[in-house]
Amino acid sequence: MDHSIYAGELFMNGSSCSQAVFLAFCDVTGIDRKLAAKIASPFGGGIGRMREVCGAVSGMYMVLGALYGYDETAEDDGRKKQLYKDVQALAAQFREECGSIICREILKNPPSDPNPPPRPAEFYKQRPCARMVVTAARLLDEIIAQHPIEE
């Protein structure tokens, strides 16, 4: 499956940026779609529309954690170090392609109103968010190809 196309479709059909990326990978993470949508919901708009870390980036990291993360019982087997290395590499790639991982910088200082605006067709023409979602999903697919998931 091309997760980047699917993530873009999810975003264009009303999912938030973070939800679109996280939901696009439910086939890989095994996380229930309804639960995934709830987990990702606070991260849209740069975390609750505060315009901090881009929601697509947050969604990307949630997928990364679901696939390669560690839990509180894990011994130090290098997973934490590898995970943080991958987080930083993804951030660098996203910055290189999109200019920033910070929502307010990507959107050129929009208001942080907690009330999301309606999303008519004009919304999608003015915002780069769909491109951020597609980029985040593509970068994730590249990482997954480099680090196949252990069953």
Segments (PLM) and residue ranges:
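Acidic-glycine-rich active-site phosphate/pyrophosphate-binding loop
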Residues: A24-P42, I106-D113
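Phosphate-handling active-site elements
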Residues: V28-K38, A66-D86, P148
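C-terminal binding/interaction regions
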Residues: L83-E151
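Active-site-proximal helix-loop elements at catalytic-domain edges
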Residues: M1-T29
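A short glycine/serine-rich beta->alpha loop
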Residues: I5-M12, F43-R51, A121-Q126
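Conserved alpha-helical segments that form or flank metal/cofactor-binding pockets of metalloenzymes
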Residues: R49-M60
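Short cysteine clusters
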Residues: C17, C54, C103
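DPxDG-like acidic metal-binding loop motif
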Residues: G59-L67
